[in-house]
UniProtKB/Swiss-Prot annotation:
Pfam family, one: EPSP_synthase
Residues the record lists as binding UDP-N-acetyl-alpha-D-glucosamine: R102, R131, P132, V133, D134, L135, D316, I338
Primary location recorded for the protein, binned into one broad class: cytoplasm
Pathway assigned in UniProt: Cell wall biogenesis; peptidoglycan biosynthesis
Claim: Ubl conjugation is one of the keywords in the record: no
Active site: C126
Entries under CDD domains matching the protein: UdpNAET
GO cellular component terms, A-Z: cytoplasm
Name this protein carries in UniProt: UDP-N-acetylglucosamine 1-carboxyvinyltransferase
Positions bound to phosphoenolpyruvate: K22, N23
Keyword Cytoplasm carried by entry: yes
Keywords: Cell cycle, Cell division, Cell shape, Cell wall biogenesis/degradation, Cytoplasm, Peptidoglycan synthesis, Pyruvate, Transferase
Gene Ontology MF terms: UDP-N-acetylglucosamine 1-carboxyvinyltransferase activity
Length: 429
């Protein structure tokens, strides 16, 4: 199992290219099941989760071809993938594949909408709370599906196709909104999705579905209206930049000091996080094709944050921000409102010398003058990268174990950081 070694203390200087968003690419790839024509996706990151989903889609009979990368991308970043679901042979998604990644459960929507049935194993993936699929199944039932649980599998069927309906989510759910959008695109009649997720990744999916022939209005607002169509066609779409990767590297610069341009990204994708970062004393400047992040002199100031659905502070940046606050001047209070059990990184940050106290969904962080390198263990995707950020600023060597979590969500992380001066290397074991 690979390990990452970091010798901290070096400020970051240079440019970091931002990859396409994994959280956008996954539903876009799944949406290829809605049509027998080819869907071409550009700027798809090279990640373990992408490879896992390609295996899952291949199990259904989807053909895929990697056709290249866009100009300016390095050998280890970015790819264009063509997906063709013209010969779907199986509407069952087995446990051994779905258990590797929760998002793969979303195949239930296009399989049900296009073929009238789907048998999908209950999901696996990150161990950060229960993440129940109840809201996703509720959306399917509202559209006329019958749902049964049989031996750990969700079996969804519809006799005469899905029918438009009003779907009111009791709480904001990104996965539920993705599933509802895909299913409603091929449902008969009008579907109204209320309390819809407003995340940029939802908008990206809606834009791709529209290119395929779907009729969608209101994506990016709490109310989305979908007029179902009888069939969808192929399309070409470029995956939007990864706002979580953008915020992660921005916080790394704030942690170490330095001056870095984050290229091929957009400030409007994460205004809340960038505003918080600016409040810490970090200089953040929007550029035509990216964001400049600079911090010189004194360390950052402590700032309180609460995670919220978009456009609020992203839960997927909570662990990274906590790492930054471990060396801040003063006390920071970080409240997690999206997922329970998302403070698993606290114990590992404490091994580096962080002072953090947990009170239910609240983490109270008292900044310390210095962190010291130590062996630590990655527990999930976002927690693992928070340890990287802390290690970049710790005295001595930090060794991060179980870094396969990083490979699920961060493309070429060591290469991007080392080009900016970080002393970071991977040990293959």
């Amino acid at each position: 199992m690979d390990r990452i070694h970091i010798t901290g203390g070096a400020p970051l200087h240079g440019e970091i290219p931002i990859s396409g968003a994994k959280n956008a690419a996954l539903p876009l790839m799944i949406a290829s099941l809605l049509t027998g024509e080819t869907v071409e996706l550009a700027n798809v990151p090279r990640l373990a989760d992408i490879a896992s989903l390609l295996r899952i889609l291949g199990n259904h009979g989807v053909d895929h071809m990697v056709v290249g990368k866009r100009p300016g991308q390095t050998a280890e970043t970015g790819q264009t993938i063509r997906l063709t679901a013209s010969n779907v042979i199986d509407t069952t998604a087995p446990y051994e594949l779905v258990s590797t990644m929760r998002a793969s459960f979303w195949v239930i929507a296009p399989l049900l909408a296009r073929f009238g049935e789907a048998r999908v194993s209950m999901p696996g993936g990150c161990a950060i709370g229960t993440r129940p699929v109840d809201l996703l199944l509720m959306a399917m039932e509202r559209l006329g599906a019958t749902i049964e649980i049989d031996g750990g599998y969700v079996v969804a069927r519809t006799r005469n196709g899905l029918r438009g309906a009003e779907i009111v989510f009791p709480k904001v759910t990104v996965g539920g909104t993705h599933v509802a959008l895909m299913a409603a695109s091929l449902a008969q009649g009008t579907t109204v999705i209320d309390n819809a997720a407003r995340e940029p990744e939802v908008v990206d999916l809606a834009e791709c579905l529209s290119k395929m022939g779907a009729r969608i209005e209101g994506a990016g607002t709490p109310r989305i209206v979908v007029e179902g169509v009888s069939r969808l066609g192929g399309a070409r779409h470029e995956v939007l930049p990864d706002r979580i990767e953008t915020g992660t590297y921005a916080m790394a610069v704030a942690m170490t000091g330095g001056d870095v341009i984050l290229r091929d990204t957009r400030a409007d994708l994460l205004h809340s996080a960038l505003d918080v970062l600016a409040t810490t004393g970090t200089e953040v400047t929007a550029l035509p094709n990216g964001i400049r992040v600079r911090r010189n002199g004194a360390g950052v100031a402590a700032v309180d944050v609460t995670t919220d659905p978009f456009p609020g502070f992203p839960t997927d940046l909570q662990a990274q921000f906590m790492a930054l606050m471990t060396k801040a001047r003063g006390q920071s209070r970080i409240r997690e409102t999206i997922f329970e059990n998302r403070f698993m990184h606290v114990q590992e940050l404490a091994r580096l010398g962080a002072r953090i106290r947990l009170e239910g969904d609240l983490a109270v962080v008292d900044g310390v003058e210095r962190l010291r390198g130590a062996p630590v263990m990655a527990t999930d995707l976002r927690a693992s990268v928070s340890l990287v950020i802390a290690g970049l600023a710790a005295e001595g060597e930090t060794i991060i174990n179980r870094v396969y979590h990083l490979d699920r969500g961060f493309e070429a992380l060591e290469a991007k950081l080392s080009r900016c001066g970080a002393q970071i290397r991977r040990e293959r074991v």
